[in-house]
Each structure stands twice: as structure tokens, then as C-alpha cells.
Amino acid sequence: MDRRRFVILVADSVGCGALPDARAYGDEGSDTLGNTSRAVGGLSLPVLGRMGIGHLTPILGVPPEPSPLAFHGRMAERSQGKDTITGHWEMMGIVLSEPLALFPRGFPPEILDPFLRETGLPGVLGNVAASGTEIIRELGEEHQRTGMPIVYTSADSVFQIAAHEETVPLETLYAWCRVARRILDPYRVARVIARPFVGKPGEYVRTYHRKDFSIATPGRTVLEKLVDARVPVVGVGKIPDIFDRKGITDELHTAGNADGLAKTEALLDRVDHGLVFVNLVDFDMLYGHRNDPQGYARALEEMDRALPRILGKLRPGEVAALTADHGCDPTTPSTDHSREYVPLVVHAPGRGGGALGTRGSFADLGATVADFFGVRHETGRSFLGDLGP
């Protein structure tokens, strides 16, 4: 087998327009990329613009490029849902016909009672659906006084445990999350998330010591099939957590987008074969959920400036794809994810550019990765043959 690389950059939550069923999710009119551009008076994305991202949705400041240097399209989500797990799983061939479990009114006693019993905790604070930054602001001081963790959920399938790093050691917080993960498996909750924070009342901030504990996939992913075929898979950022480390041969923790982009660039100097699968979380975590279009715009422009250094590492015959896992429109009243198309911008050195159209599933990306490495996979439709000779 030729030694070559396929790079996936997931710009977490950078959707590009509402899906036809967005109304059913309360997301009609969402367009993370387009609405952000208009909210800030225009975006400066010269690299992505030349690659053709302006063809995907109207972006103020980024007109459609008549002769794009990359292949461009968008992907629709076939799975039911609009969360991180659902989006990433579908990319790698797992399409969910039923959404993962939600608990909009908080978690019932049959979940919390065994959690308290096994952890030895006297109780929890919160147990509501809430914005993470808001509930930490509201309950952080009481948490520090009592030692009881803050438990909350959201519009996603998540059980989140927040604790101050000076009140609860990180390893204790992670141990609590492992207990919750085991209890929640039968309930089909996608993720248990450790949400550590620091600071003092009124000035609490979450840290990059976050850790996700994901439910196991209901089938085998493209990642596992690659590893079976002895193709290395490097997960960067929260990718290993999302797939419960199955189908991952190496991993790199990151502390935000700038760190993730720099580590990806450095990684390509030492990895000469395999899949490099990267999640850039700041779009979602710092700006989408906080309804901060200015911050979102700055993060997009930061990524655009970094792309040439990453794409310049690729050799002829290799591929890099930029995409997203869902939307999180910072201009809407909601602070939750949005049901959107996601971008598909593909750089293949020496192959030019063109349109990939609207893909019927995120799984087309995984099918293309499998095709690229000569691995058999049934879900999705590969676009490798559309990338030119």
C-alpha cells in the first residue's frame, strides 16, 4: 500500500444553512456561517474563499469563487439528531435511525440514586437543562461551599458534571464520570462530560481539562476498519473521546483551536501515512453556545490564516477535507446546536477544484476515506472519483 495521508478537519459547529427538516428541531432559519458573516459586517476568509466555500451559502465578504482551487459541496445529516456524537458517528458510517436519549427536565431518581450511592456523594446541584456557563455562574459558589457537583444537561444527549478544580481533583471528577457512564449506558445517553472550571465567584471560567465519556457505537466504524487494515488513525482534540478510543491508534489532546491547528501542522511533519482526524472545538464551546458572533468570526479567520501551513504539508495524491458535525448559530436566540448542512471543502494537491454538490449523508466522507485507503465499507457514497484524475 502506498504511504499517504488523509486529513479531516472538523470545524465543530460550523454549519452552512438549515436542513429541510430544521423546523422540527426549532432551527428554521439557522445558518451558522452565513448569519455570523452578516452579524459582524462581513468575514475575511481569503483562503477558504479561494477554495470555494462561498458557493455553499451566502457569506458576506466571501463571494463565490468562479475558479475554485478546491472541491466544494455540503453534506446533509441522515441521522436523527444534531449533536457531536451523532454527527461524527455518521461521518464514519454509523447512521442513527432513532435519536439518542434526551432529559430536558433533568435526570430521574433511577439514574441519580445509583450515581449518588456509587460515588458516595450526598447530593448534586442543578439537575436541569441549562447553559453550562450560566449554571456555573449561578451554582459555582454553592458547589465550592458544599463540595456537591453541578449536574446538568442540554438539548443534546448529555450528562454533564461541573466541578471547580480546587474543590474536586480532576481524577475524582473523571471517576464520577466513569460511574455515570456505566449507569447511563442502558438509557442511551450519548456522552457524560466532565466540565472542570476555575476562578472565583463571578469570574468562573471552564478549562480545557474537559473530558468526554461516550457511549459505544452500535456498529463498526470506518476508523475500526482502517485499524484492522493496519492503517494508522490519529485522533486530535476530542475525536478519541467521541469514539470511545475505538479505531484510534494515537491521540493528541488540545487546548483550543490554535493549539489544535499547531499540533496538526507539527503532526504532518512526523506522520507519513494514515488518517489524521481533528476536531476544533472553540467554535462551538466558546462562541456558538455563548451566542458570540464576533468571537465566532475571529475563530473562523484564525483558522483561515492557519490553513495554508497545514495544506502545504500535503503531497500529491493526498487529501484534506474541512467539514463540521452540526451547526450552532450564534445569532439566534437559542444557545443550542442547530440542524444544518455542513461544509465539505476538499483539497487534493494537483487535482484542481470543482463542485461536489449536496451529499445525502455525512457518511459520504467516511466512505471516501475507506475508498482512499482501499478498505471495504458499505455506508455512504465515496466522492474520491470526483476529485479529478
From Swiss-Prot:
It holds the Pfam family Metalloenzyme. Its EC number is 5.4.2.7. Gene3D superfamilies: Alkaline Phosphatase, subunit A (3.40.720.10), Phosphopentomutase (3.30.70.1250). GO terms for cellular component: cytosol. Belongs to the phosphopentomutase family. This is Phosphopentomutase. The keyword Manganese applies. It comes from the Bacteria. CDD domains: PPM (cd16009). It catalyses: 2-deoxy-alpha-D-ribose 1-phosphate = 2-deoxy-D-ribose 5-phosphate; alpha-D-ribose 1-phosphate = D-ribose 5-phosphate.
